[in-house]
Amino acid sequence: MTFETIFVTLEEGKTLVFETGKIARQANGAVLARMQETWVFSSVCAANLEEPVDFLPLRVDYQEKFSSIGKTLGGFIKREGRPTEREILTSRLIDRSMRPSLPNRLMQDVQVLSYVWSYDGVTLPDPIAICGVSAALAISDIPQISVVAGVRVGFVNNSWVVNPTKAEMDVSRMELVLAGTENAILMIEGHCDFLTEEQVIEAIEFGHKHIATICRAIKDLQQKVGKKKNSDAIVPLPEEVQSSVNTFVEGKFADLLKIKEKKAFEAASKQLEKEIVEKFLEENEIFTALNIKTAFKQAKSDYMRALIREQSVRSDGRAITTIRPISIDTSFLPRTHGSCLFTRGETQTVAVCTLGSEAMAQRYEDLNGEGLAKFYLQYFFPPFSVGEVGRIGSPGRREIGHGKLAEKALSHTLPDPAKFPYTIRIESNITESNGSSSMASVCGGCLALMDAGVPIKTPIAGIAMGLILDNDHVTILSDISGLEDYLGDMDFKVAGNTEGITAFQMDIKVEGITPTIMQAALAQAKAGRQHILDIMKEALAAPKTDLSQYAPRIETMQIKPNKIATVIGPGGKQIRQIIEEAGVQIDINDSGLVSISASSPQAIEKAKSMIEGLVGEVEVGKIYEGRVTSIVPFGAFVEILPGKEGLCHISEFSKQRIENVGDFVKQGDILAVKLLSINEKGQYKLSHKATLSE
């Protein structure tokens, strides 16, 4: 293969470079994509399937090598293993960007591998990975409908920025990753700080201009070194099979769609499919089980589309903008800190909010270093939620992706950590699913936060929008069901309040989605959110004013950073003593912010008093409860703060004359003393007598 390099300038100082022909020459396609000193290598390989399948077997694995930043993993095992959450989310971004660009009925097993080989800590690698994978696909012999590219868009100082640096992202009000072809958008994912629908559209249009530029460069690379596409890998569905199935099911879908309950509908649909397979199977060689099932799915999709297009009626009988019935039960679980049973149609979640100290925070490590997440949402999708038997174990990619979307949606409404110093964990337990369980997680999670007494800024709701695009006829659907997601052209999830958007995610199965269509979808989503928010406010108008009796109490105090070692003590001895004596949990960060959590306010006050005693500075004129450390003929030495000891002269014990100090106090006694002065040697003059009149 010929070595080739292509340069694409997006903005000043941001040039994307594609190289091929030097590395991994036995792969179907391989590209090294780089910007600045962030380099991402991507490869694609395909193998013919032994047995045809009715789905696209695309597998994407993205990995961030720690060697890319000159580090080696700690611990006994030194090689990268189980993917991190960030790697899984990036793998999903690449998959969702590439899948629409691959043809239906592609009978090849396609594997995408993408590795971060060099990371400069400035240029974020995920949009580079999307572009690198697309370029590798473009120059390979794997069939592809169209070339794809991806970018990240930020909103910094009221200006749109393409592929913002890490520093820019830290202050950006939006994070948007989008992918598309030269003429259309295929995938978007992002979150923002209550930006308007108009601003989101503006960001998408801004990003798409740069996507088009990158797509043209990838096409240039394809023309120079691209392999001939393997058209034999695409096995189209014979028209005879489709027409025969269409004729057989004519009139049967009307009866099928009278069944509104999901499980009953699926059972009847499978029975009808079975009848079709039994009738046509082996009628001739083109009537395979796979072909018949594919034709049945297409016929079902065509009928659903025609029903919407011609009668404005959906498969479950709803109108285009109708949202399924919603029921809400807050404080659903008696011993949790906050909970909510949220049901929308046949989609349901039990959302739970748990409050804790910093020790409960989620710790993680990636190429940008170690981090601590004090808010996180975990999404659980057990097989019983769809009436199936399945594997239970570590979360799948879908669970992680859905949880992160709901987490981002709610993160923008959380209170200032300085005013509410709790770690917040939400779990969304999906107990029923028929479309849009991630948006149910947003609604249920928000209500669980409010039920727990978290003083959120504003309630947040989420809704999933769908699209039926037939030539020039466009229909936008509110609150799509699982069937509409499966057979429709778009899944557009939007979360926020009535004033702005906090998170969004869109996947498109067809080209032709224009900014006008997206604008209409966002406007319809806003009306849907308003409807859902009104119902949520009826159930719980505002966050509860008091925390649950079962939630820990947390208070913070600030100490000087140079006093941290004093509080911790040698080998942690001092802080362990405070924790044991007061019955609290203590966390101290590098800035000296001390977080104290306990089940009672009294325990917190005791711990604060002990810490203040360790780090406090002595003040002339202040009264201290000191401990008598030793007695001498002329008085007693009293420790007023740890390590700070002064003399209370015999004349300062009482207003009456005393002959023997030992008759007045004993070693170890607690004695109230007032600090009268500090001499030039730093010695403390104490008086018990001065406290008697106060």
Swiss-Prot record:
Catalytic activity entry: RNA(n+1) + phosphate = RNA(n) + a ribonucleoside 5'-diphosphate
Cell location: Cytoplasm
Domain KH: residue ranges: 552-611
Pfam family, one: RNase_PH_C
Occurrences of domain S1 motif (ranges): 621-689
Cystines in this chain: none
InterPro entries in the record: ExoRNase_PH_dom1, ExoRNase_PH_dom2, ExoRNase_PH_dom2_sf, KH_dom, KH_dom_type_1, KH_dom_type_1_sf, NA-bd_OB-fold, PNPase
One record GO biological process: RNA processing
Enzyme kind, highest EC tier: transferase
EC number: 2.7.7.8
Family of this protein: Belongs to the polyribonucleotide nucleotidyltransferase family.
PANTHER family xrefs: POLYRIBONUCLEOTIDE NUCLEOTIDYLTRANSFERASE, POLYRIBONUCLEOTIDE NUCLEOTIDYLTRANSFERASE 1, MITOCHONDRIAL
Protein name in UniProt: Polyribonucleotide nucleotidyltransferase
Gene designation: pnp
